[in-house]
Amino acid sequence: LMDLVGSTPAMQSLRESIRIAADDDRTVLVRGEPGSGTTLIAEGLHRCSRRAGKPFLRIDCSLHSVETLEHQLFGDATADGFPGYLKMGDGGSILLDNVDTVALPFQKRLAQLLEQRATSVLNGTMDGPNIRFIAATHCDLNRLAMEGRFRDDLLQHLSGITLQSPPLRVRTND
């Protein structure tokens, strides 16, 4: 967690929360204002976890169409096609950065994927992908869900553990 600079109580608390979350395999939602280090938090979480020696893959959801996101995550079924992050990241972590920008149809697909993963973890079967999902956002997903712009079921699946990055304005000494 050396990349997360700062000695304020807020940063010390965040580092401790990351260490605790690293031992838990649930999906993590990282929230914070732009520039507050949500990607660094996700990377630090991965490096502290038992998945540290496995891939850490990042998808910036704001940069891709639904079709590209689908291809990047699930891959191409053809023999010589792109395997997709779910296969490439086996045993590791996938960061869904700017998850608030995902279109509603793909949100449904993500919710189904996370439901499958959660069920297999609870049953101890690991039938679904052996991936830890981390989502990051600068938006209030609860508000977006109330406005009908973000699926409630996806929000529930993403909020297994929530980490809040302290705003830069409250850690001016850092």
What is each residue range found by the language model?
Residues L1-A145, L158, T162, P166-T172:
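AAA+ ATPase active-site-proximal loops
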Residues M146-F150:
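Charged helix-capping and loop-helix junction motifs
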